[in-house]
Every structure is written in structure tokens, then in C-alpha cells.
Amino acid sequence: MIEKLIFYMGYPFVRYALIVGVLIALCSSLLGVTLVLKRFSFIGDGLSHVAFGAMAVASVLNITNNMLFILPVTVVCAILLLRTGQNTKIKGDAAIAMISVGALAIGYLLMNVFATGPNLSGDVCTTLFGSTSILTLKIEQVWLCVVLSVVVVVLFIVFYHKIFCVTFDETFAKATGIRADRYNLLIAVITALIIVLAMNLVGSLLISALVIFPALSAMRIFKIFFSVTVCSVVLSVCCAISGMLLSILAGTPVGSTIVAADIVAFLICCMIEKIAGGK
């Protein structure tokens, strides 16, 4: 097995896939703790459906680099989703359901009406659940992922204390002069960036798992925000690497294998919590 891994690591596309996988896992887990604590977990699910709709439009328009179209559309929808959720007539969960289901339906409709290839079901399945496209990345795509990942990490580090305050008590944050609405907007925009980055890795339907599972796993062991965030990052990166290597060796779907690794990590953390609690 070790020899087989060394053999595969000799290929540039495998190294590119591991780099992108680690960066995506890092970014998604950084914000995951905040989204779970703020009960924004499903915003990732909603934006992933929006990204699916944007990808369908890009496919119909024959846009060569669809990332340049999907990214701004998802960011704009993240802002609209946040603004709509603050509307007293439409609550947050209803706004997410409305936008996500609408984008998913319109995207699938466009792919049916303006089918660009003979294998429609394969294209849809690939978009929803991820594909081997992570193993066919070009160096330009890797650099784009690196740049966006650096942006996400820098924004999180620079505004860490503000995000911390807004996460736990918006009323207190406002009382201390923090513009909570601006930082909620920042969280939504960063989430949109992460969603777009993760689409090639796990597909639009499984993206939420990368955000939620590492955070929930870390919360089983640690109770301090910083410790939970660090643990979440470590678990997410380890699960991404192990999932991708197992996928390469066993020939299983990349996204599903990574999510399965996250589930196993969550179950192990739950066992550790029970054992520690028993003592």
C-alpha cells in the first residue's frame, strides 16, 4: 500500500488534488464553528444549491472558466440571503429554503432544456456529489484556490475577535460599538467563497458536511472557542487527507469518502466525550 501511495504521489495531479483538498478543509472548518454556534449551519446548504444553479447557467452559456461566474453569483446570493433573513416577514430558515430550492430547481431545469452534453444524468450527479475533476485540476485552478484560501484565512484572523463577539452575543457586540450586521455579512461572504471552493471536491449537496462535522466533532471534546476552532481545523484536514488517499487507493468517490471519514471522526469524538464524562 505504501509503495502504491508513493507511486501515485509521483503524479502532479495527485499532489494538486491534495493541496486543494487540504486548503478547502482548512477554510471550511475555520468558519464551521461560527456557523454552528450561530445556528447558520444550513446557510452552507442553501448557498451550495445556489452554486449549483450558477454552474448550470455557466454550462448553458458555455463559459470556459465557470468559477469566474459562480463566485460572484454565490456571493451576491449570500448577501441577499442574509438581508432576506433579517426581514420580519420572511424568517431566516424560510429564506434559506426559498432561495436554495429555487436555485436547485432552476439549475436542473436549465440543464434539461439546454443540455450541453449527451450524459445529462452524469453531469447532474457530478455537480451534486462531486467527481474525479478534483484529480484533473490545472495549475491555474490550484493557484486560484490558493489565493481564495489565503483571503479566507486572512479575513478570519484579522476579524477573529469581532467574529467571536458576534458569534456569542450580538446584543453585547452592538453595545460595545461593533457593527454586527457588517460582520454577519462578512461571515456570509466568506461562507460563499468556501462553498465555491468546495464544489469540485465534494459536490454541492455534500458541502455542508465539510462545514458542520469537524465543528461538531471538536465541540464534543473542547468547550473553549479557540480550542474548538483549532481542533476543528486539525480534524478537517486529517479527514480530507485520509479520505482522498483512501479514495485514490480504493477507487471510491472523493467527496463521499471524505464525508465518511468526517462521520467516523465524529463518532470517535462522541466516544471520547462519553468516556471522559464517565470519569
Describe these PLM feature segments.
Residues 1-26:
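Membrane-interfacial amphipathic/re-entrant helices at transmembrane-helix boundaries
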Residues 4, 96, 100-157:
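Transmembrane helix-bundle core of multi-pass membrane transporters
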Residues 18-23, 67-72, 94-98, 142-147, ...:
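Hydrophobic alpha-helical transmembrane segments
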Residues 20-28, 54, 58, 69-77, ...:
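Alpha-helical transmembrane segments in multi-pass membrane proteins
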Residues 33-48, 52-118, 218-230, 247-251, ...:
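Short loop segments and helix-boundary regions at transmembrane helix junctions
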Residues 137-214:
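Helix-loop-helix "hairpin" substructures at the membrane interface of multi-pass membrane proteins
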Residues 200-256:
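Transmembrane alpha-helical segments in multi-pass inner-membrane proteins
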Residues 255-259, 263-279:
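Cytosolic-side transmembrane-helix boundaries in multi-pass membrane proteins
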